[in-house]
């Protein structure tokens, strides 16, 4: 296969390193009450929480106590913790160290040192939106094993898309595999004609208990007109989703 033309995301462009900027950004998250997921013990445990206070002078922040005491104990024993949230479509992620227990308004809470860096992805192309089940979209791969194959889309963004494989062991979709004769009809906005490269694989368990394989792909040879088609399609899905939730 030809060499990959995919350029890795330069996270340095989206990283806050100034203590003042970090404290301000986390304060805004706390002020608006956005939900935050904390992954502890190398992802073995997690809690859903909210940031409570950010103390720039002391260099610490506090966040809500979890609902399950056993999980809270495991979080307190974790030396490295990953915080993730998406306030107003802006994905925020940072790593913090050991967490301690404190009291806030006579209630238990967690406290941690402010992180040294915060990744703040503002570019909308890195946020994928799921395609509707009622109007499935397919990617036709014309150069698959000397024939064509249609794969259903799970989600799409300007940065890439996820596709369902027809079987858990479907061959030809290892990481790094490229296909150059692909077409995707994003009705009513237009058709994409491009290449794709498999970037990751994910095993998912369906509602019926069966396992399914999903692959994440980046685009190859994405032109400006095709970017516009994707933008319009994603915007259309976002408007429909907002209308459904009122």
Swiss-Prot record:
InterPro entries in alphabetical order: PilZ_domain, Split_barrel_FMN-bd, T3SS_YcgR, T3SS_YcgR_PilZN
UniProt-recorded name of the protein: Flagellar brake protein YcgR
Function: Acts as a flagellar brake, regulating swimming and swarming in a bis-(3'-5') cyclic diguanylic acid (c-di-GMP)-dependent manner. Binds 1 c-di-GMP dimer per subunit. Increasing levels of c-di-GMP lead to decreased motility.
Transmembrane segments: none
Subcellular location: Bacterial flagellum basal body
Domain PilZ: 122-234
Gene Ontology CC: bacterial-type flagellum basal body
The gene coding this protein: ycgR
Entries under Pfam families matching the protein: PilZ, PilZN
Molecular function per GO: cyclic-di-GMP binding
Protein family per UniProt: Belongs to the YcgR family.
């Amino acid at each position: 296969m030809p060499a990959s033309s995919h350029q890795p995301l330069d996270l340095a462009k989206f990283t806050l390193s100034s203590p003042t900027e970090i404290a301000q950004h986390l304060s805004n998250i706390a002020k608006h009450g956005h939900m935050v997921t904390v992954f502890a013990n190398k992802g073995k445990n997690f809690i859903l929480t909210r940031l409570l206070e950010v103390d720039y002078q002391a260099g610490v922040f506090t966040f809500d106590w979890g609902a399950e005491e056993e999980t809270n104990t495991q979080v307190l024993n974790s030396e490295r913790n990953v915080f993730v949230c998406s306030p107003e479509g802006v994905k925020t992620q940072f790593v913090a160290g050991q967490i301690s227990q404190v009291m806030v308004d006579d209630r238990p809470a967690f406290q941690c040192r402010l992180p040294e860096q915060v990744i703040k992805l503002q570019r909308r192309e890195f946020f994928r939106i799921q395609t509707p089940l009622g109007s499935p979209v397919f990617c036709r791969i014309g150069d698959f094993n000397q024939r064509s194959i249609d794969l259903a889309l799970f989600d799409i963004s300007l940065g890439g898309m996820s596709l369902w494989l027809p079987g858990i062991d479907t061959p030809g979709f290892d990481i790094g595999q490229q296909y150059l004769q692909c077409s995707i009809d994003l009705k009513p906005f237009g058709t994409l004609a491009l290449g794709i490269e498999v970037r990751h694989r994910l095993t998912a368990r369906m509602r019926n208990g069966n396992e399914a394989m999903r692959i994440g792909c980046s685009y190859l040879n994405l032109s400006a007109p095709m970017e516009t088609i994707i933008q319009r399609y994603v915007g259309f899905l976002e408007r429909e989703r907002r209308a459904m939730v009122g």
